[in-house]
Amino acid sequence: MEKAAKKEAVESLNGLFKTTSVAVVAHYSGLTVAQMQKLRSQMKLAGASVKVSKNRLAKIALEGTDVVAIGSLLKGPTVIATSNDPVAAPKVAVEFAKANEKFVILGGSMGTTVLNVDGVKALASLPSLDELRAKLVGLLVAPATKIAQLTTAPASKLARVVQAYASKDEAA
C-alpha cells in the first residue's frame, strides 16, 4: 500500500470513527468470503458497517475520536463494526458470533466507554431505537384508545337495552 493510499484510508476511517456512536471489535480468522459477505449484508440491513483494515492504520485513525480506547483490542486479524444506533452493530455481531464460532467478539466501545465482551452482549440484548419508539407510541396511543372506548360504551349499552326491549315487544 502506497503512502498516499494509507493516508486516504486513515482519513476515511477517522471520519467513520468520529461519526459513530458504537464500535465492536472482533477476530474473523478462518471465516470464508461467503461468511464475510453475509456479515456485511446483515450489518448493512441493520444500518451498520464493517471495516477490515491494517491494525496500525486503524490505531492511527482512532486518535482524536471518542472510540480511541478500542485501539488496545486491535491485535491479529480484526474487523471493526460501527453504527450510529447503539444497538445495531452489537446485535448483529453477537447473532453472527453465535452462528459462526470463528467470529470472536473481543470488545467494543460506546461513546467514550470501553466495553468488554459481556458489555457488547448486554448492549445487543437491548431493544433497538425503532423498537423503543414503537413501544413509546403504543404507550401514548393506548390511553386515548381506552378513553374513546369508555365514552362510546354507555351509548352502545343504551342502544343494546333499547334493542332488547324492542325485540321483547315484538316477540310478545
From Swiss-Prot:
* GO terms under biological process: translation
Keyword Oxidoreductase included in the entry's annotation: no
PROSITE patterns in the record: RIBOSOMAL_L10
Q: Which Pfam families match?
A: Ribosomal_L10
Q: Which UniProt keywords apply?
A: Ribonucleoprotein, Ribosomal protein, RNA-binding, rRNA-binding
The function of this protein is:
Forms part of the ribosomal stalk, playing a central role in the interaction of the ribosome with GTP-bound translation factors.
Instruction: Kindly state the subunit structure of this protein.
Output: Part of the ribosomal stalk of the 50S ribosomal subunit. The N-terminus interacts with L11 and the large rRNA to form the base of the stalk. The C-terminus forms an elongated spine to which L12 dimers bind in a sequential fashion forming a multimeric L10(L12)X complex.
What is the name listed in the Swiss-Prot or TrEMBL entry for this protein?
A: Large ribosomal subunit protein uL10
Recorded source organism is Rhodopseudomonas palustris (strain BisA53)
Q: Which gene encodes it?
A: rplJ
